[in-house]
Amino acid sequence: MTAQTPNSFRNLPDERGHFGQFGGRYVAETLMPLILDLEREYNAAKADPAFKAEFDDLLEHYVGRPSPLYFAPRLTEELGGAQVWFKRDELNHTGAHKINNCIGQILLAMRMGKTRIIAETGAGQHGVATATVCARFGLPCVIFMGATDVARQAPNVFRMKLLGAEVVPVTAGAGTLKDAMNEALRDWVANVHNTFYIIGTAAGPHPYPELVRDFQSVIGKEARAQMLSRTGRLPDLLVAAIGGGSNAIGLFHPFLDDPSVRMLGVEAAGHGLDKEHAASLAGGRPGILHGNKTYLLQDEDGQITEGHSISAGLDYPGIGPEHAWLKEIGRVDYTSVTDTEALDAFQLLCRTEGIIPALEPAHAIAAVKKVAPTMGKDEIILANLCGRGDKDIFSVAEHLGVSL
């Protein structure tokens, strides 16, 4: 662990799960004992060298970590400014960053003696990662997925079923991630005695935002060491896409106390911030959803509105509470990118580097495309390539007018 200083950006949440005014735990009374139990177990696991050893061993031999740090020479040349580097988390087993967190949480579930796993999923990546760890450890798995997402992420739905998971399509609301999460929370309340809920992003009631961040911060810890070893210094700018925000907080957190490192989180602007989008920091205001206080997309009456993004993994109408706090104190900058800009960036990376990214990190690449030309050639941008694009080729083809 890094030594904490009193004025560190890295020592929150407080004991009640707050990041400034954000976070907390707003849950049904039936869930509160379980949430407190989870917090106790997590604190015990953090102090247990055997837990860390098992987590690290699985990350190395099952997930394939550390993931490479890659300098993108042709993209750098094309953009004509700062050097562009990628943390290649799309090379993990299952093709995204989600597995880092699932490994940590299933170890916690088994430590707590739970025998059934549930999860929500949007793009299907977290569902696939959860189904994967359940198969690996022989536990039954139920995945709640919005009916809209089931339709647009057919390959991942089939993967989950192949891995032995039961996939429950959720038709409530718009049938997307928010609705799937509501349904998962309902199931958890009803089956609290034997069920562990593996939340897929750095949101939800405390201690979830903290533990998801801690499991994902392997990304930033590796990247920091790799960057120092390869270049002898830290990057000038970190860039990551944000839905709920777990890949971004995983990259950012180990660098928060390095004042020379700027950070940029990239939300989904969808059709535009004045139209349908999923940029809760840019277009939302504080409210309470899924057990925590954070920025949310809501109407005048405080009803949660639907997020829209070409990327199924970014259309959550909220954001992890730590990001809300980091925005409020000004430590991290946040911007947003439209569907069209993300599609252009998706194609740019394919053509320049031979890497097909997921639509989620394509948003980060679109932001890099804007900012790199404004920086010096001796400056370094490190972007998190948090998922591969296999799952998205059908929807990209459709948007480009190609029938497969």
Curated annotation (Swiss-Prot):
Subunit and partners: Tetramer of two alpha and two beta chains.
GO molecular function: tryptophan synthase activity
UniProt function note: The beta subunit is responsible for the synthesis of L-tryptophan from indole and L-serine.
Gene3D superfamilies cross-referenced by the UniProt entry: 3.40.50.1100
Modified-residue entries (N6-(pyridoxal phosphate)lysine), positions: K98
The family this protein is said to belong to: Belongs to the TrpB family.
Name this polypeptide is given: Tryptophan synthase beta chain
PANTHER family named among the record's database cross-references: TRYPTOPHAN SYNTHASE, TRYPTOPHAN SYNTHASE-RELATED
A cellular component term, taken from the record's GO annotations: cytoplasm
